[in-house]
Amino acid sequence: MKHLFLILSILPLFAQDINKHNISLGMFDDKTGFSFIGYTYDIRQTKIDEYFIGGGTMIVGFTGSAGWKHYYKKSKLSFYSVLSGQAVIHMGFSGLMPNASFGLEYNLSKRTQVKIGGMVAILLDGSSVEAGVLPFVGLNFRR
């Protein structure tokens, strides 16, 4: 009975609209911040907006995130911005990290994009505040 309940509760996640699941590979990420591999799920999508939750990982760190992605121009080459809040846990530090990103997204196919841009991040770890500007580049796969 427990297995049936588990299957029935997970099944709607896979029966939803396409393009809600995103997997990102590359150096950092616009949605998940300090990550080489990231996963985001779009809670709500419109033609030019995406509201997401997700997580990413580096070799020894983890990032959980939630935010909003807005497309200014959506075509084969799209310009967009992302505002997100992230919780970062790493061997050397942990804390909250508000993040703003601007980027270009080039559609290689219907489900594959190349992303390049920059992000401004502020790390709040309780005892200090650090800010920085970082580039990101990567591949995004939508499912």
Walk through the language-model features, giving the residues of each.
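N-terminal hydrophobic targeting signals that begin at the initiator methionine
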Residues: 1-2, 17
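Short glycine/proline-enriched turn or capping motifs at secondary-structure junctions
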Residues: 3, 126-136, 141
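Sec-dependent N-terminal signal peptides
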Residues: 3-13
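Short glycine/proline- and aromatic-enriched beta-strand/turn motifs that initiate or cap beta-hairpins
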Residues: 15-60, 142
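Outer-envelope beta-barrel architecture signal
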Residues: 17-23, 35, 47-51, 75-81, ...
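Residues that define the transmembrane beta-barrel architecture of outer-membrane proteins
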Residues: 19-21, 31-37, 58-64, 77, ...
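Residues on the lipid-exposed face of transmembrane beta-strands in outer-membrane beta-barrel proteins
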Residues: 27, 37-43, 66-70, 83-87, ...
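Sequence/structural signature of outer-membrane beta-barrel proteins
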Residues: 28-32, 44-48, 56-62, 73-75, ...
